[in-house]
């Protein structure tokens, strides 16, 4: 029971004291505001300077507009001064030391942001002021400020920015209102980190400026924000794509010319870099200060333009063909002989360890397989062996006769004639050819017959001659001689001594079809030689183009790498 009574008495006493404090605060406010004017500077002597202490707390960096060069910040501004007309004896007011009243009831210094860039004019916030019994007034005011900031984007995205916030009295000179710094720098204890900028300090400096319009000094306090851009976002979204795309320009030289996509690749890369360049240009201020990333894009675009131009030039070389002049001697020595080895440009199946004697030429000299020389010698003897010719060979050489473009088999028709022609030039058989077996039934099948005395004899094997490529140097016949797939008019003999009329082997029987077949082979070989010479000339130009492609590919790789290292290294 006593406890309840005690608690009730304490609560009543607290209520009485609180109501007493409220009555004294109301009485104090009425006494202070009596005959008080907020329009006049609160000093007892008008010649005396009123000191105002300014302290800035940076809460947040809301935005940095590089294009318009405007910095938006969220600040807490604290101003402290002494009002000579707002003092009281705290003992007269029941020990009341502090009251909080609206700021519009008291005089406030007209301290503003000099480099304000806000389009809308806004006055100070009407927050309460804290009034102490000794006349000290503290005014805490939040403010979202937009200040002009000279942005230097030369080192974008590795740039530092120094933005100033200058505060001073707009109408009072230094003899009337003096501004002092509450701290040597801005307060960053409550700073909220920004996703794009890092704040590395906010030093303050007090300046006294003499303007040309006035003879009195005007003090101000300038806070300098040290901002560093967070570059990781721009590295992954602007620099790295550009770096990777720039390496596609040299790879355009490695793309085969026959693919038809070399120029398309260069143009596509150029368009991609143009898009990235526009993205950078839209975010940068239109000034003479070009960022290094912009220079990097321009340099890369220049290199891609040059590589595309060189690609067009090299493709013209690649597709020179037979109509072009032969490759100059200096180009063969410099490009084909030396540069191709340095740049490791070899034909299919070759490498840097292949001996010179084993390397495949641009086009094979013989259209035959590995043992072409041996086969040529054997067939050479087959047709003109020991200067003789068998009559049955003349007929066996043409088991099929061309007639009006159709093939007709005459094997059975000439069978009797073949029997009569056996051993026309002697009955012996060359042992060199008797050992050949399993050949074509028109050329290598042994024939047997009964001779005088009843003994069984073998007719000689058919001997054919293979015309070597070196023996077929002649002039191409006119197209008019070609009818129904063969030659109807006689052709001149080749110019080589092996096939001239004087040295040609004589046949005991006239064989015009045999001679016509030889002439047809000569014409086909001549066409093949001309085609091979044309292909060889085009192949030389193609190899020149391939070596130049490989040379410019490495040159551009080195240039892109060095340019990237120099520009990025200088920017960082």
Curated annotation (Swiss-Prot):
Cited Gene3D superfamilies: Neurotransmitter-gated ion-channel ligand-binding domain (2.70.170.10), Neurotransmitter-gated ion-channel transmembrane domain (1.20.58.390)
CDD domains in UniProt: LGIC_ECD_nAChR_A9, LGIC_TM_cation
Tissue expression per record: Expressed in the liver, olfactory mucosa, pituitary gland, hair cells of the saccule and spleen.
Predominant localisation class: membrane
Residues with glycosylation annotation: 51, 164
Segments on the Cytoplasmic side according to the record's topology features: 318-550
UniProt name for this protein: Neuronal acetylcholine receptor subunit alpha-9-I
Source organism of the structure: Oncorhynchus mykiss (Rainbow trout)
């Amino acid at each position: 029971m006593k406890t309840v009574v005690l608690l009730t008495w304490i609560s009543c006493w607290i209520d009485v004291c609180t109501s007493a404090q409220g009555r004294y605060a109301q009485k104090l406010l009425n006494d202070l505001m009596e005959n008080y004017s907020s329009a006049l500077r609160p000093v007892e002597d008008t010649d005396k300077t009123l000191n105002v202490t300014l302290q800035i707390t940076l809460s947040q960096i809301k935005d940095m507009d590089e294009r318009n060069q405007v910095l938006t910040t969220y600040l807490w501004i604290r101003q402290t001064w002494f009002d000579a007309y707002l003092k009281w004896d705290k003992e007269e007011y029941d020990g009341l030391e502090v009251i909080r009243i609206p700021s519009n009831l008291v005089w406030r210094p007209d301290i503003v942001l000099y480099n304000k860039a806000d389009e809308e004019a806004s006055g100070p916030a009407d927050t309460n002021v804290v009034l102490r019994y000794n006349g000290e007034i503290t005014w805490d005011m939040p403010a979202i400020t937009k200040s002009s900031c000279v942005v230097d984007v030369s080192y974008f995205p590795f740039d530092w920015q120094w933005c100033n916030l200058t505060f001073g009295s707009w109408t009072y000179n230094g003899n009337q209102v003096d501004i002092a710094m509450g701290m040597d720098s801005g307060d960053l204890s409550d700073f909220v980190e920004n996703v794009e900028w890092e704040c590395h300090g906010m030093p303050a400096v007090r300046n006294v400026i003499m303007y040309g319009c006035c003879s009195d000094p005007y003090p101000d306090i300038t806070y300098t924000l040290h901002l560093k851009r967070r570059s990781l976002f721009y590295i992954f979204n602007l620099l790295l794509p550009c770096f990777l795309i720039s390496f596609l320009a040299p790879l355009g030289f490695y793309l085969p010319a026959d693919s038809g996509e070399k120029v398309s690749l260069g143009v596509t890369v150029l368009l991609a870099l143009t898009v990235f360049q526009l993205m950078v240009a839209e975010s940068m201020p239109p000034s003479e200060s070009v960022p290094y990333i912009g220079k990097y894009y321009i340099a890369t675009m220049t290199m891609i333009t040059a590589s595309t131009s060189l690609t067009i030039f090299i493709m013209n070389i690649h597709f020179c063909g037979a109509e072009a002049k032969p490759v100059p001697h200096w180009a063969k020595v410099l490009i084909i002989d030396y540069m191709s080895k340095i740049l490791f440009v070899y034909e299919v199946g070759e490498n840097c360890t292949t001996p010179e004697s084993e390397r495949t030429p641009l086009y094979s000299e013989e259209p035959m397989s590995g043992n072409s020389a041996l086969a040529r010698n054997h067939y050479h003897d087959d047709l003109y062996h020991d200067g003789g010719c068998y009559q049955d060979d003349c007929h066996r050489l043409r088991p099929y006769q061309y007639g009006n473009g159709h093939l007709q088999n005459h094997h059975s028709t000439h069978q009797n004639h073949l029997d009569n022609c056996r051993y026309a030039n002697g009955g012996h058989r060359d042992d060199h050819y008797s050992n050949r077996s399993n050949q074509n039934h028109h050329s290598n099948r042994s024939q047997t017959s009964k001779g005088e005395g009843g003994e069984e004899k073998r007719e000689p094997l058919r001997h054919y001659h293979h015309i070597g490529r070196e023996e077929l140097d002649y002039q191409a016949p006119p197209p008019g001689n070609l009818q129904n797939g063969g030659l109807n008019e006689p052709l001149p003999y080749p110019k080589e001594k092996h096939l001239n009329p004087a040295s040609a082997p004589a046949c005991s029987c006239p064989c015009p079809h045999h001679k016509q077949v030889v002439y047809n082979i000569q014409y086909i070989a001549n066409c093949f030689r001309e085609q091979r010479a044309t292909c060889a000339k085009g192949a030389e130009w193609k190899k020149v183009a391939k070596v130049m492609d490989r040379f410019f590919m490495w040159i551009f790789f080195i240039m892109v790498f060095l340019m990237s290292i120099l520009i990025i290294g200088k920017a960082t």
